[in-house]
Regions:
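PAPS-dependent sulfotransferase catalytic domain
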Residues: 9-197
Length: 197
């Protein structure tokens, strides 16, 4: 069922965890490939050993007072919002020639994020309890995006079918229960929303 954080970020950060590639089968027997970190499922951005190092270092990321932090559940418009915020900070409505992935907490090593010049537009799909406390303590600007969960489910379904590393070829009616039960990447959508209330 539902998976939420039952531990504080300091408890999470003080325990080195391991990652593994898992397959979760839908009601029709079709499996989706993803990575699991202490029961928390994420997309397989990198091999598990690299993702494990990234995740173990997330609580130690140093935020800056001029950072803008875009937070959103998966498939909620993070990329578009990241582009718009980046354009606003650049003072120009021009295409950003770098990927939001280069500033995504759970996708790249801490050294890469640390090397981004200010002002940074960082982003993440992680639940609030898995984010560095410093993001809130430094009082950097946070942009929270919430999208109708019905739209998120449809978009995530097409994403899983379209991205080869997920290796998914199931039907939506079999996919939807996995979404509703929080068994997909970033676990439960409603838990994400409730944590931000």
């Amino acid at each position: 069922g539902r998976h939420h954080c039952d531990r504080s970020p300091s408890e999470i950060s003080n325990t080195k965890k391991k990652m593994s590639v898992i397959k979760i089968a839908d009601n029709g027997g079709h499996a989706i490939t993803m990575t699991s970190f202490d029961g928390y499922h994420i997309a397989s951005f990198s091999p598990p050993e690299i993702l494990c190092e990234i995740f173990n270092n997330i609580p130690h990321i140093k935020f800056r007072h001029d950072d803008v932090f875009v937070c959103a559940p998966l498939k909620s418009g993070t990329h578009w919002t990241w582009e718009i915020v980046s354009m606003l900070l650049n003072g120009k409505a021009e295409i950003i020639h770098k990927s939001k992935m280069t500033q995504m907490l759970e996708a790249v090593p801490t050294e890469i994020i640390d090397g981004v010049p200010s002002p940074r537009v960082l982003n993440s799909h992680l639940h609030l309890c898995r984010l560095p406390r410093e993001a809130l303590e430094k009082k950097c600007k946070i942009v929270l995006i919430l999208r109708d969960p019905r739209d998120v489910a449809v978009s995530l379904y097409h994403h899983c079918k379209g991205v080869l590393k997920h290796d998914y070829d199931g039907m939506f009616e079999n996919f939807l229960p996995l979404f509703l039960e929080g068994k997909l990447m970033y676990n439960n959508y409603l838990d994400y929303v409730v944590e931000w209330e």
